[in-house]
UniProtKB/Swiss-Prot annotation:
Family recorded in the similarity comment: Belongs to the UvrB family.
Annotated source species: Leptospira borgpetersenii serovar Hardjo-bovis (strain JB197)
InterPro entries reported in the protein's UniProt record: Helicase/UvrB_N, Helicase_ATP-bd, Helicase_C-like, P-loop_NTPase, UVR_dom, UVR_dom_sf, UvrB, UvrB_inter
Residues in UVR domain copies: 625-660
Motif stretch (Beta-hairpin): 92-115
Residues in Helicase C-terminal domain copies: 429-591
Lineage: Bacteria, Pseudomonadati, Spirochaetota, Spirochaetia, Leptospirales
Binding residue positions for ATP: G39, V40, T41, G42, S43, G44, K45, T46
Protein's UniProt name: UvrABC system protein B
Transmembrane segments: none
Gene that this sequence comes from: uvrB
């Protein structure tokens, strides 16, 4: 029987991929629930995953431990499965400060957040795809275990419209309002609809095209997909389904019942506080909850509404919330990428969330039912995901013990060997590393540097910038889509060096990187243990000149183990290449945006700076003085041509170089 998935790739399975794909698919087809793939960096684990998905023909959830790697996997699976639905589901917050209370200083911190509209659209598209079709691959972060609206309520709220249906225009408007669309006849943007005479134009929250519904009396005369900017028809449709604009949908009757239940819980909690002489807490919970209930009655919404989700969805005390996993209908496959990191992360989410909320409950800021607005605990997660493939270069004991089959993938299809590992003294490590960096830059290769602290990363970035290197610092405060852009710019050569702490280990796929430098490699701990070292060294495994330099004054047990394992794998790979006459080749991959996003309008400043970057890339000049002279020359030329805006931007660029270099005279 033909698979519902179809891979598009110029490559065929090679190296250890052939046996790995066969063994994994065969194990699952024979009833195995847990399988582990131990695959070295650059061995094509993602391609193996795609082949397994195609062979099994099951809807698939791919779980990654951070947004950057999830975005990279999303791009790769989209390229493998262009005819299928490949979706992206991560937290839509650019910034998130959860509600919290600090008893020691009597400080209450209000919830504060900033939502990324593009990611919100992708999340909604993911759930709509799961309801529409079976050939779906969703790449997700740990966000998939957090509470989401009930799939039953979500499905029941879908507005189905068909040409020839008899329905009043106003009835369609009411349905759209119920599923959280806003009527706005002026601003036709995502999640809004407008009414123009006998037609309604809807901009679905999960799509880039609009939908026009035209009526003739009380009958739907035509349905069209339209360009949301020009309103021109793209395609005539026989029918359409409008999915809710938000995941949390609750009907009016349910809200009334929920309010009654919340008031009953409030009464019991206030009585509990009074019995324990906690009068302040009693007054606090009464005033806060009553205010929320007034807002809910009048507006159908209140700040922190998620804290009442148990009542709004009709769950029992302690019952788990619905999450993305519940939207998978029937049998599906879970792939846990970099499982040695992702599995512990899943286990830690529940405990961290409960600790914060318990304090809010104890001091009267929230009702006890707020504790049920939570991520899944680990046991619930295991129960929901019976068919699981763990993927890692360094799987933990948990995965190995749970798996009925462990498959190794050491031989790379490209014949590439594991990197050469060198250990060097920390004495003059920055200058020594600079020499190695310049060697790589001269031949168009890239460099990753990993440090132990944020301050060291920042200082090193500043130092290398001052001496003219094109360097970027990747850290946790950089927004999700901007991290993706930095990695793309490294591949394109806008940057030569990328510096980070914990973001340069698992999964980053950058074939141009030929050198990985690990500073303070002998400082045993989370970032310098065996698994971390293996993962970090592996970042150079996609380049034929791959080298890892470990700066250390002693060889720790973790270093020795990592070096020995790298040598073991390298020997197996060398023997294989010798036997079959294979010449190693650097992986060649196109440089694309990992996540396609709507093009933002660029300002004239953006365009000028881009031009400056191309013309006056600092690495082309022997020193900063020459670079400044060139910028000054260009500035005077722009002023002479009366292009004062360009001249001002060039002046600012020139001054910024002076500011960064105090030793330079004006």
């Amino acid at each position: 029987m033909a698979s519902i998935f179809k891979i598009h790739s110029a490559y065929k399975p090679a190296g250890d991929q052939i046996k790995a794909i066969e063994n994994i698919a065969d194990s699952f087809q024979k009833g195995a629930e847990k399988v582990t793939l131990v695959g070295v960096t650059g061995s094509g684990k993602t391609f193996t995953m795609a082949q397994v998905i195609q062979n099994l023909g099951l809807p698939t959830l791919v779980l990654s431990h951070n947004k950057t790697l999830a975005a990279q996997l999303f791009r790769e699976f989209k390229e493998f499965f262009p005819e299928n639905a490949v979706e992206y589901f991560v937290s839509y917050y650019d910034y998130y400060q959860p509600e919290a209370y600090v008893p020691s200083s009597d400080t209450f911190i209000e919830k504060d957040s900033s939502i990324n509209e593009e990611i919100d659209k992708l999340r909604l598209r993911a759930t709509s795809s799961l309801l529409e079709r079976e050939d779906v691959v969703i790449v997700s972060s740990v966000s998939c275990i957090y509470g989401l609206g009930s799939p039953e309520e979500y499905t029941n709220s879908v507005v189905a419209l068909k040409t020839g249906d008899t329905i009043e225009r106003d009835a369609v408007i009411r349905k759209l309002l119920h599923i959280q669309y806003n009527r706005n006849d002026i601003d036709f943007s995502r999640g809004n609809f407008r009414v123009r005479g006998d037609s309604i134009e809807i901009y679905p929250a999960y799509h880039t095209d609009g939908i026009r519904i035209e009526f003739f009396g009380d009958e739907i005369d035509s349905i069209s997909r339209i360009n949301p900017i020009t309103a021109q028809t793209i395609l005539k449709l026989e029918k359409t389904y409008i999915y809710p604009a938000k995941h949390f949908i609750t009907s009016g009757p349910k809200v009334k019942v929920a309010i009654e239940n919340i008031k009953a819980e409030l009464e019991a909690q206030a009585l509990f506080f009074r019995k324990n002489d906690k009068l302040l807490e009693a007054e606090r919970i009464i005033s806060r909850t009553n205010y929320d209930m007034e807002m809910l009655q009048e507006m159908g919404y209140c700040n922190g509404i998620e804290n009442y989700s148990r009542h709004l969805t009709g769950r029992k005390a302690g019952e788990r919330p619905a999450c993305l996993i519940d939207y998978f209908q029937g049998e599906f496959l879970l792939i846990v990428d970099e499982s040695h990191v992702t599995i512990p992360q899943i286990g830690g989410m529940f405990a961290g969330d409960k600790a914060r909320k318990q304090t809010l409950v104890d001091f009267g800021f929230r009702l006890p039912s707020a504790l049920d607005n939570r991520p899944l605990n680990f046991e619930e997660f295991e129960t929901l995901t019976p068919k699981t493939l763990y993927v890692s270069a360094t799987p933990a004991d948990y995965e190995m013990e749970k798996s009925s089959k462990v498959v190794e993938q050491i031989i790379r299809p490209t014949g590439l060997l594991d990197p050469i590992v060198e250990v060097r003294s920390t004495k003059n490590q920055i200058e020594d590393l600079l020499v190695e960096i310049r060697k790589r830059i001269d031949v168009g290769e890239r460099i990753l540097i990993t440090t132990l602290t944020k301050k060291m990363s920042e200082d090193l970035t500043d130092y290398y910038k001052e001496i003219g290197l094109q360097v970027a610092y990747l850290h946790s405060e950089v927004e999700t889509l901007d991290r993706v852009a930095i990695i793309r710019d490294l591949r394109k050569g806008i940057y030569d060096v990328l510096i980070g702490i914990n973001l340069l280990r698992e999964g980053l796929d950058i074939p141009e990187v030929s050198l990985v430098a690990i500073l303070d490699a002998d400082k045993e701990g989370f970032l310098r243990n065996y698994k971390s070292l293996i993962q970090t060294v592996g970042r150079a495994a996609r380049n034929v000149n791959g080298t890892a330099i470990l700066y250390a004054d002693k060889i720790t047990d973790s270093m020795a183990k990592a070096i020995d394992e790298t040598k073991r794998r390298r020997k197996i790979q060398e023997d294989h290449n010798l036997k079959f006459g294979i010449t190693p080749l650097t992986i060649r991959k196109e440089v694309n945006d990992i996540i396609e996003r709507e093009e933002k309008k660029r300002t004239s400043e953006d365009l000028v700076l881009e031009d400056v970057e191309k013309k006056f890339n600092s690495k082309k000049f022997p020193n900063k003085e020459v670079l400044k002279d060139k910028l000054r020359e260009e500035m005077m030329k722009a002023a002479k041509e009366l292009d004062f805006e360009r001249a001002a931007i060039l002046r600012d660029k020139m001054l910024s170089i002076q500011i960064n270099d105090p030793s330079t005279e004006n």
